Amino acid sequence: MSTKVPIYLKRGSRKGKKEKLRDLLSSDMISPPLGDFRHTIHIGSGGGDDMFGDISFLQGKFHLLPGTAVEEAEEDGSFDLPFQFTRTTTVCGRELPGGLSPLLKNAISLPVIGGPQALTLPTTQAPPKPPRLHLESPQPSPKSSPQEAGNVDIWRVPEAGLPHNGMSPEPEAEEPFLSHASSLLSLHVDLGPSILDDVLQIMDQDLGRVQIPT
C-alpha cells in the first residue's frame, strides 16, 4: 500500500478487500467545539505576583504555585477564598498598584465580545464637498445700482438741443434716422407699386378664364 495513506486507514478486512472510508470514520473521531482561544489566564514564574485571570481551577491550593511570594500571601490571608477571580489589568487604563512585576503592567485582558469594553471603530467624517463652479454670470438684483451690478454702462440717445461730450449734435445727420426710429410701434413696409399691380393683374386673368357652367 502507499505510504501516503494514514495509519488508521491501512486496515484491511480478512477477505483482503479494502474497507470504505465511511466505514472507518466515526463520530467519535470529530472533536467538539473548543470555544474561545483567548489568553484569559496567565501564571508566570513569579507565582502570585505574576498571574491574572480565572484561577479557580487551583481550588485554594496556592502552595503549588512557584516562587516564595505565595507563602507571604498565605500569611497575610489574601488567598483565603477557594475560588478567586483576579483581573489585574483592564482596558480602561486604570493605574496598577505598586509592587507588581513589569510583566503584569504590560498584560492586558481581552474584552468580552459585545460587552461595554468592546472595541469600536472611530467614526469617519465625510469628505468636504468640492466647490461648485458658477458657469452662469450672476444676475444683478433689480434694486442694485449700476455700480453694484458690475459697472454696466447704459447708453442713452442724447436729446435734441443738448450738447454731447462738449459738442453740439448735427441736426441734418440725426433727423432722417430719428424720424423712423423715434417710435418702436411704427412699422413702415414698402413693397413697391409694381409688385401690387402684378398681383392684381394675375388675379384678374385667373377669374376671366374660369367659365361658369350653364
UniProtKB/Swiss-Prot annotation:
Question: Which SMART domains does the entry link to?
Answer: PBD (SM00285)
Q: What is its main location?
A: membrane
> Phosphoserine is carried by which residues?
31, 101, 137, 141, 145
| GO CC terms, sorted | cytoplasm; cytoskeleton; endomembrane system; membrane; phagocytic vesicle; plasma membrane
Signal sequence bounds? none
Cite a single Pfam family from the UniProt record: PBD
Q: Which InterPro entries match?
A: Cdc42_effect-like, Cdc42_Effector_BORG/CEP, Cdc42_effector_prot_2, CRIB_dom
Which GO biological process annotations does it have?
A: actin cytoskeleton organization; cellular response to type II interferon; positive regulation of actin filament polymerization; positive regulation of pseudopodium assembly; regulation of cell shape; Rho protein signal transduction
**Which residues are recorded with the post-translational modification N-acetylserine?**
2
According to Swiss-Prot or TrEMBL, what is its membrane topology?
Answer: Peripheral membrane protein
- Keyword Membrane in record: yes
Offer an example of a GO molecular function term for this protein.
small GTPase binding
Q: Where in the cell is it found?
A: Endomembrane system; Cytoplasm, Cytoskeleton
Q: Which residues form the CRIB domain?
A: 30-44
User: Which Cys-Cys disulphide bridges does the record give?
Assistant: none
| Entry keywords, A to Z | Acetylation, Cell shape, Cytoplasm, Cytoskeleton, Membrane, Phosphoprotein
Q: Does the keyword Acetylation apply?
A: yes
Where is region (Disordered) located?
118-151
Subunit structure of this entry? Interacts with CDC42 and RHOQ, in a GTP-dependent manner, and with SEPT7.
The record's comment about this protein's domains reads: The CRIB domain mediates interaction with CDC42.
Return the similarity comment: Belongs to the BORG/CEP family.
Query: Which function does this protein serve?
Result: Probably involved in the organization of the actin cytoskeleton. May act downstream of CDC42 to induce actin filament assembly leading to cell shape changes. Induces pseudopodia formation in fibroblasts in a CDC42-dependent manner.
Give the protein name, as stated in the record.
Cdc42 effector protein 2
Species of provenance: Rattus norvegicus
Q: Which gene encodes it?
A: Cdc42ep2
